[in-house]
Amino acid sequence: MPLNLYYAGLYEQCLSSIAVEKKRGTTHQLLHTEGLALRALNRISEAISSFLASQKLDPFDQSTTLELAKCFYLQGNYPSVIAQCDSIISTEGRAPWLAHQLRGLASFRMGDRHAAEKHLFLAYDLHPTLQAKQLIGELQAAAGKSQEAIATMNDIIALSPESINVLIELGLLYVKLNSLDDAFECFSRAVIAVQKQLACRSSMTLSTPQDSFIFSPAFFSLGYTIQAKDPRTALLKYRVAASLKGDSKDPHIWANLTYVFVSLSNLEAALVCATRAFQLNSTSEPCRRALGHVYICLGDYCRAFQILSPAMGDTRAYESQWLLGIAAAKLGELRIAMVCLSKAADGGLYAACLTGLLIFLQANDLTTAAQFSVKLKELDPDNDENLRQGKAAIKRLRKLVQEENSTVEGQAVSEKNEQLTTTDG
């Protein structure tokens, strides 16, 4: 029977069996099974054709409509997902929970968060699983409802303390809120959960690609939270993340390794990592930033400027704009430096604003320096050292402005005396 072959995971044999069966006649169930096997082989377009043909033979079979909606979702055809799900929801007094879940996910992808939230909550009410609740939490996070998302994720953790994905998602929410201690706890718990699962296996070899997708981010995220304070331990976490992933093609691991080696003053290793990240994804802003950062540390400002220059047109690449401003200033391009550092300062980067103040103090451009000093007072310092430098720079600016004013006043008095002397003569 084709269906038995499908459930056994023998998809090619299942399709061969269906081809034989079709010679004796095509049925709704046969086409449905064909669609399942084709989708399992990632032949999505062919699967859609089979499900549509099955649907024509029996338009009232909900299971075929749901499978068709799944295919459209995998294809990214979200309007069709909504159409299929709505056809079930509108004709059923109590529609299957999966119809609401798919409807909610498709609505979210199309930017209709109100409809997404409505249908995901309906799905959860009909079928209250941890996965459904996690989807609600992710939706809340994407909608900017961080506190609601954190509460939802914590509810899941209370019921399932070792849910690796949820712990990672919760940790990332805390990172966005700059609650790094809470993030560290979440990522640490995720790593412990991973280690427990690995300990249950006969070796460190992972059984499925999905395992590495889940396990690797736990170590990566933990490394991220500690790399500023403990780069050596962070390096170990990144190495584990890379080994669990099974390949070396994750550009973001390489980019983060760059900063670890910079912290360890190993610029040669940092350059290797940054170059690798850039080669893997040259359009990624974090990868460009990592390579530009290393070139600045090496004093190669021309290359840094070249790598970082796309940040000029990016409205949110504040850290890259900060670095680009430094490179521009070192190359004598003070106008470009002012534009870049101003953008970064407007983005809330205290360090970028401080850099602008220091650069234009050194250039004796007190007017521009004063503009950065005004902005600096509005921002929260990112660390005690930058706060100390900021106060010292503002104090120096005041002194220079006073000296300049005194000089101007002295010149004015001197000119007035000369005029009086000329008149007396």
From Swiss-Prot:
TPR repeats lie at residues 28-61, 63-95, 130-163, 164-197, 251-284, 285-318, 320-351, 353-383. Residues 405-425 are annotated as: Disordered. PROSITE patterns: TPR. InterPro entries: TPR-like_helical_dom_sf, TPR_rpt. It is found in: Cell projection, Cilium, Flagellum. Coiled coil: none annotated. Its main location: other. Keywords: Cell projection, Cilium, Flagellum, Repeat, TPR repeat. This is BBSome complex member BBS4 homolog. Transmembrane segments: none annotated. One of its GO terms (biological process) is protein localization to cilium. One of its GO terms (cellular component) is 9+2 motile cilium. It comes from the Eukaryota. It comes from Giardia intestinalis (strain ATCC 50803 / WB clone C6) (Giardia lamblia). Belongs to the BBS4 family.
